[in-house]
């Protein structure tokens, strides 16, 4: 485990790409222990000058879309191109069972064994915001360790897609063709943040369905307002199982990066993502401090009970809580 005495040496080893040190650094960053948090802050501050040159990708898709098969085929393609690949799997655990929704890395056997690849799951335990914060910090560790491409994976449920879209350069929505109702299976909000839509499982007897789905998605994307002036989102097809179409996806990602880099938009997006991340973390930290105050916590619970019992309107409850905070902290 990394400690105060070994921090400088651990940073050196991390910069050299040592996998064991990277895993230890991730464990440190994930820890909620106050001493570990202070140490991980020093670690993250120290590696920031070495971050920013990595291509950040997000991949989402509903269960059954073949994400693990796709990521294995895609990751192995990148490795053959001479690149180092890290996969961070943000896992919004089931709110009912607490179990994992994402498959584990044993479904990516070849990629998991590859020396040029690193796979790390990030379970959320029902709190996606915390998981996305950790994923962002783990992504920075991978960048400092010299990985050329970092892929953040999540399932297409809840707010997981938009959370991931806010931390990556290029966001890919993995879909499968159905019986003509494909657009019902992808939310408008997701289409608005997707830079590429990839229809997987273009194999067997599914070619006609895939062609129909591709046309539907392309038509819908042309109606929606573009996310970037520099880029018209593309719809591509592939068979991850047969490893067909994977190289075309990589070429499209390169086209995307080239277009946004040339205009300066990519740098602007990353800067805005950092600002939004700081704002969100500030809000969470302020709330944590508020609820650590026993007087506020008690008053909040009383207000909440009154709102539940319809003896107080939510607007009045908000005003009273605001006045309480003003009195306690600002007067």
From Swiss-Prot:
GO terms for molecular function: ATP binding; GTP binding; GTPase activity. One of its GO terms (cellular component) is cytoplasm. InterPro entries: GTPase_ArgK, P-loop_NTPase. Changing residue 154 to A: In strain: RC101. Binds and hydrolyzes GTP. Likely functions as a G-protein chaperone that assists AdoCbl cofactor delivery to the methylmalonyl-CoA mutase (MCM) ScpA and reactivation of the enzyme during catalysis. Part of an operon that encodes enzymes converting succinate to propionate. This is GTPase ArgK. The gene is argK.
